[in-house]
């Protein structure tokens, strides 16, 4: 059955196709004979209770100089036989939330939305990991700079980060004796107005921050370890980390087994777990990445696994 695959993403002209997971999904959908539709940025709306989008027919190809072609934009009304790939990057700001609310109406009209709009609203990527405390390192989330400071001092070293960042932005490592600790906490909490996450520093970060992908609740057999370079402690590829594929360890599979069933139950078809050493640190649900790197290193087709699940869901 041929489907209409509607992609909501950041501007397609600015992506780097060698690393872009959304591009891998589009290639796979096109290979299967599905029709691709690109939503104009800001192009979701509600008309008299119906979810609609300004879309253009899209074709994609493995060409770094010219990787897509768009047709003319028209209005599409969401309904059955459609799959919506919600792939906008964080921050999960008010406009992002509004888009998920439009997509919830699309879902009620019969479109299949990946990932589930309600789940995208419910799961902050930093806080969602704490729903599985058996998997996590010691963590404190607070607006209280004094409480956060006490946590850092109690553990010797900690990582401090905002709840709305991505790609390693505004993440600090601090500890006992750091003269900048107070100002870091003042900045992150915005003087006590913003929740900030403090997590015990995990020395295993030197071996990489592992990205484990879940497809329909099941882990891909390989993860991408994002290894910090030089004197950097952040492994994020966006922060200069080097990606190295590895088979999942027994502990990785245990963590995936703790998280996967709940993600599947909530309609989170494609999820990225961040694991450092033996600990889950984040659950990424908005636009997880690393598919292209893992596909290239191990001859995988992870987007194929996703579309197997999508097509099975559409057939039900």
Swiss-Prot record:
Q: Where does the chain bind ATP? A: 151-208
Question: Which key words are in the record?
Answer: ATP-binding, Glutathione biosynthesis, Ligase, Magnesium, Manganese, Metal-binding, Nucleotide-binding
Give the cofactor note text: Binds 1 Mg(2+) or Mn(2+) ion per subunit.
The protein's required cofactor(s) are namely: Mg(2+); Mn(2+)
Domain of life of the source: Bacteria
Q: In which pathway does it act?
A: Sulfur metabolism; glutathione biosynthesis; glutathione from L-cysteine and L-glutamate: step 2/2
What EC numbers are recorded for this enzyme? 6.3.2.3
Segments forming domain ATP-grasp = 124-311
Question: InterPro entries, alphabetically?
Answer: ATP-grasp (IPR011761), ATP_grasp_subdomain_1 (IPR013815), Glut_synth_pro (IPR006284), GSHS_ATP-bd (IPR004218), GSHS_N (IPR004215), PreATP-grasp_dom_sf (IPR016185)
The name this protein carries in UniProt is Glutathione synthetase
Q: What is the lineage of its organism?
A: Bacteria, Pseudomonadati, Pseudomonadota, Gammaproteobacteria, Lysobacterales
């Amino acid at each position: 059955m041929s489907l209409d695959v509607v992609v909501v993403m950041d501007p397609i002209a600015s992506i780097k196709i060698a690393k872009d997971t959304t591009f891998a999904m589009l290639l796979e959908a096109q290979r299967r004979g599905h029709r691709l539709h690109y939503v104009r940025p800001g192009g979701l709306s509600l008309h008299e209770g119906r979810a609609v989008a300004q879309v253009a027919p899209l074709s994609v190809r493995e060409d770094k100089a010219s990787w897509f072609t768009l047709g003319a934009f028209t209005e599409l009304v969401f309904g059955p036989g459609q799959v919506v790939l919600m792939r906008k990057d964080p921050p999960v700001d008010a406009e992002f939330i509004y888009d998920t609310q439009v997509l919830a109406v699309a879902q009620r009209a019969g479109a299949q939305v990946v990932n589930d709009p309600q789940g995208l609203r419910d799961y902050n990527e930093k806080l969602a990991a704490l729903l599985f405390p058996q998997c996590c390192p010691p963590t404190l989330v607070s607006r209280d700079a004094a409480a956060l400071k006490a946590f850092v001092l109690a553990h010797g070293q900690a990582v401090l980060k905002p709840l709305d960042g991505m790609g390693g932005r505004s993440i600090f490592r601090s500890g006992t004796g750091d003269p900048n600790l107070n100002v870091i906490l003042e900045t992150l909490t915005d003087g006590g107005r913003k929740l900030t996450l403090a997590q015990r520093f995990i020395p295993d970060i030197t071996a990489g921050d592992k990205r484990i992908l879940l497809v329909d609740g099941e882990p891909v057999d390989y993860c991408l370890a994002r290894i910090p370079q030089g004197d950097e402690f952040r492994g994020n590829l966006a922060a200069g980390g080097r990606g190295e594929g590895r088979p999942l360890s027994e502990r990785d599979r245990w963590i995936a087994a703790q998280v996967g069933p709940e993600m599947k139950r909530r309609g989170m078809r494609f999820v990225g777990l961040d694991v450092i050493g033996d600990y889950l640190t984040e659950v990424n649900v908005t636009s997880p990445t690393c598919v292209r790197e893992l596909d290239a290193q191990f001859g995988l087709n992870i987007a194929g696994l996703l579309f197997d699940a999508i097509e099975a869901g559409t057939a039900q």
